[in-house]
Amino acid sequence: MNNHQAPETETLAETDNFMAWRANEPDGETTYYLQLGRATINFFMEEWDELLASIAELKQAKANEEGMFAVSFDNVDVWMDNEDWAEFLQLLRDLEK
């Protein structure tokens, strides 16, 4: 008999290529996920709160000399071109609502 319970999930924001969602795990913990294209980054609640607190700063980011934007999550750096960055910012704006 399989007693495995699937987490309850809720989409928090979504664009054409990016998505943010929350999972309420069977053990009572809440985790958050940020899917950026093919990459999915998971966050514990405290880390998610840090991301939300940094939205204003992320909106002010400038591209480097190659026209690329970078965002760092714990041990992961994600580089985006102008089009992807604009979509990422839209996702962040939707999360602020």
Regions of interest found by a model, annotated:
Residues M1-K97:
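Positively charged, low-complexity terminal tracts
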